[in-house]
Amino acid sequence: MPLMFAPVERAMKVIKILADEKTKKHLENLGITIDSELRVLSSGASVIVLVKDTRLALDSGLASKIFVVQA
């Protein structure tokens, strides 16, 4: 499922990122890669996620390109 539809406060695992290489590299620098785990803290116009003890805000366009499953 796209990250923007992931349930709040559940551990999720990234399985696919549908973005260009520049965006994938940016996400990698933030700690979001295939097989990485994250937790959605809130969602709406932007999605707030917790990745390795760091909170990140992702706009809904980017969050729709990150696919996750429950970890």
Residue ranges: model-predicted function:
Residues 1-71:
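Compact, glycine-rich, soluble single-domain proteins
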